[in-house]
């Protein structure tokens, strides 16, 4: 048990990147010896948010990875990932853990429902996306269970030597 890149610690479901609100690229673990600096923060009457450079986290998979998260004055959340591939394509999984029930309602859209409240999750991407829900049941008997939660999001493939933007909006519904 250790914190190295191939340490058994990362086989624990809750500690792996596939069980968190983040990207997984080419099915690979995030790089342990990476750094994800906050490169910009902003706050105005219209919006507040931050930008994080995830390039070193995904250095084995893509040339560049930047995530911007914005909350606007209407409480709409926008998560934008800008990725740039090199000599290999990037199979990207965008995942969010939620206690809500999820229903895919159309191309690049999903509705989340919890305690009578509803939220729309939409994806605007430069590539084709496949909306997905995943069980949150861990693969190993020794893992803690995650009752009442699922993972939602999408999968997409970014071709070699290409820049792409993946923009997710979470919009409360009345």
Label every model-predicted segment.
Residues 1-174:
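CBM-like, beta-strand-rich accessory domains located in the C-terminal region of large
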């Amino acid at each position: 048990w250790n914190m190295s890149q191939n340490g058994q610690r990362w086989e624990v479901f809750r500690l792996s990147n596939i069980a968190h609100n983040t990207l997984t690229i080419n099915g690979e673990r995030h790089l342990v010896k990476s750094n994800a600096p906050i490169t910009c923060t902003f706050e105005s009457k219209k919006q507040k948010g931050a930008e994080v450079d995830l390039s070193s986290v995904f250095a084995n998979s893509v040339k560049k990875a930047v995530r911007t998260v914005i909350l606007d004055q209407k409480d709409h959340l926008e998560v934008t990932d800008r990725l740039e591939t090199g000599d290999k394509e990037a199979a990207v999984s965008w995942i969010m853990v939620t206690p809500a029930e999820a229903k895919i309602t159309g191309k690049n859209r999903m509705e989340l429902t919890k305690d009578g409240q509803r939220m729309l999750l939409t994806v605007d991407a430069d590539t084709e996306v496949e909306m997905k829900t995943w069980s949150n049941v861990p693969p190993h008997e020794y893992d803690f269970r995650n009752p009442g939660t699922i993972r939602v999001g999408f999968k997409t493939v970014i071709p070699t030597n290409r820049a792409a933007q993946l923009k997710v909006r979470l919009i409360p519904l009345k």
